[in-house]
Amino acid sequence: MVSFRFPFSFSQPPRATTSFSGFSISAVAVSVTVGAAAAGAAIAASRNPSHPILEWAFSSHRSSLSPWGSITLADESVVEPKTGFSFPASIGDSRRLLGVGLRKKSLLGLKNIDVYAFGVYADCDDVKKLVGDKYANLPASEIRGNKSFMDDLMEADIKMTIRLQIVYGKLNIRSVRNAFQESVGNRLKKFGGSDNDELLQSFTSLFKDEYKIPRNSTIDLTKDPGHVLSVAIEGNHVGSVKSHLLCRSILDLYIGEEPFDKNAREDFLDNAASLAFDN
């Protein structure tokens, strides 16, 4: 028999949460897959009263759990509620999912289309060190609302990944390249002034016309140690650019003051702040 605790909270407005073990899950589905020798379990949270969160079958064992539970996070997934697209709760050795969101785009000013769902991952050891070193004396509620905390997360040499999962089936790589040309270009000007055309080109040129991005395909934007931005399409590395400014500009799109999805940003900050108190 196995026991499991998912440690982070994710939101969907309006927020309706079910709390357990010091954390809450709000309007997302968390699925767990175990091997042939173990039983499978699925856990879902919903505002629909006919589908309440399932009882924890192994609640009597929760007190003995480590902070991450006894099932590896690689076996878990979190669903972005508006699209139904799922994201693994962990990627790599120590990057954990701290927020999920949706990128929308206005089409001819008439309607919004869902372009891609995204998940924001961060190396938990790196985040815990940052929080512990600088914010150890503050409660989590104050850390979350501290603007310098957000700035520190984007400025620090923390390994992070933004995983994009394509929702709009008619999207092509040229559209992605043009969209980043605009959005990342604006952030480069915001943080570094106007003379960054060469840096922007070094990033957008990684999105070559030969790459296909059908619905459900993934694009990973990873900030590696040393402020190196690495890009992977469908798990295949396509190039890297070493630039602190570029990394900051990319992260600002998703967790900055004017993000693509405010709920995703709030979830990310909440969960990042909670890491300091997850012993």
Swiss-Prot record:
Disruption phenotype: No visible phenotype during vegetative growth, but shorter siliques containing a reduced number of viable seeds. Elevated total fatty-acid levels in leaves and seeds of plants grown at 15 and 22 degrees Celsius.
GO biological process, one term: fatty acid metabolic process
Domain of life the protein comes from: Eukaryota
SUPFAM superfamilies noted in UniProt: Chalcone isomerase
Gene3D superfamilies assigned: 1.10.890.20, 3.50.70.10
Record key words, sorted: Chloroplast, Plastid
Known tissue expression: Expressed in developing cotyledons, young seedlings, roots, seeds, embryos, macrospores, preanthesis and tapetum. Restricted to developing and reproductive tissues.
Pfam families in the cross-refs: Chalcone_2
GO cellular component: chloroplast; chloroplast envelope; chloroplast stroma; cytosol; plastid
Keyword Nucleus: no
Binding-site residues, dodecanoate: R103, Y116, S183
Localization: Plastid, Chloroplast stroma
Family to which this protein belongs: Belongs to the chalcone isomerase family.
Function: Fatty-acid-binding protein. Interacts preferentially with saturated fatty acid. May be involved in alpha-linolenic (C18:3) metabolism.
Protein name: Fatty-acid-binding protein 1
Species assigned in the record: Arabidopsis thaliana
Gene: FAP1
